[in-house]
């Protein structure tokens, strides 16, 4: 192989290695093993065995702080089962704030078509009848044929359960009770697994709901220092399946050597005192990968200096780093949130989703983009979820009784957003002007 061919091959291998590792920092990535919660995984496996293998209707509750990996933990455990053996319905207390939507998703999984125009009460009643609830007519006519349903067990994941029940109103408690009640029909296997960052949420349930959660909740434990180191090593190491065995072994040997460096270990200990969640280390991984350069002999492979430089970068203003990491669309939505507040004469610091989406966001689309090609509402809500997870916005502690998306507001200094817009080179000029000129 000529020197040119070898150089091109090495460049290709480095690019491929970068892509593999960068993908591991995405929210959709699931590791082959879940470090630090092995005991908790066995408990969830037992629940899922009942739900999927034994086709029993069951409930489970996974608790842990925001960003602790509750949803990833569930998805990791679910990987054990063949996807053709169950149906999964995912609901979110943040996104699916419309009760009818939740019911229709569940009915769809059960193979039940809901007639249009039914209110919540009649929708529940319609589903119950379809599931085999005895009516006066069926009691009289015992020859009534039972409807055949989807034989696959249905697992319903409700993420951020506390947002569904935040208002603690009777209607919301009744909604959840009625959902759980659907699992008691003999001719269907319907199980509920909920995640929440509110560890004492069971104490907030009415007695009739609390009685359903007889087993102790699964608590995601904080990661130990050793677990964090193992996870980080796994994140930046190349897999056995990597194309070039020699390149993989050299890469992994450099990773092993670097992580044993005294200075790297000390930096890990300092950072661990502040952060013990995996997503806090994704920024470090991305910074390390960004600094690798085939043509720079000092940065050709991962080494202790590159890792320590990454820690130094993280020691900058954390807010500044987070704002740099936002996508252009996320930053645009953030600017719209700020301008929604500026453009209204309301005393309440919190704004509604409609004020943002149908107000400032649509106004921006018309004024700068000359069209109404906005992101869809579910996509916008997911962006708000991400901003909430990062702590850039916060929601009111209580949702309103109608089940609308909770009001929210900026939780950081607006000046930091303006400064970030000025310093980011990837933002369109119109967005920079929108944020820096409209807000000042």
Swiss-Prot record:
One GO cellular component term: nucleus
GO BP field: DNA replication initiation
Residues annotated to bind ATP: 64-71
Localisation per UniProt entry: Nucleus
Keyword Nucleotide-binding in record: yes
Principal location class: nucleus
Listed Gene3D superfamilies: P-loop containing nucleotide triphosphate hydrolases
An example molecular function term from Gene Ontology annotations: ATP binding
Domain of life: Eukaryota
Pfam family, one: ORC4_C
Function: Component of the origin recognition complex (ORC) that binds origins of replication. DNA-binding is ATP-dependent, however specific DNA sequences that define origins of replication have not been identified so far. ORC is required to assemble the pre-replication complex necessary to initiate DNA replication.
Family: Belongs to the ORC4 family.
Quaternary data: ORC is composed of six subunits.
Protein name as annotated: Origin recognition complex subunit 4
Species assigned in the record: Dictyostelium discoideum
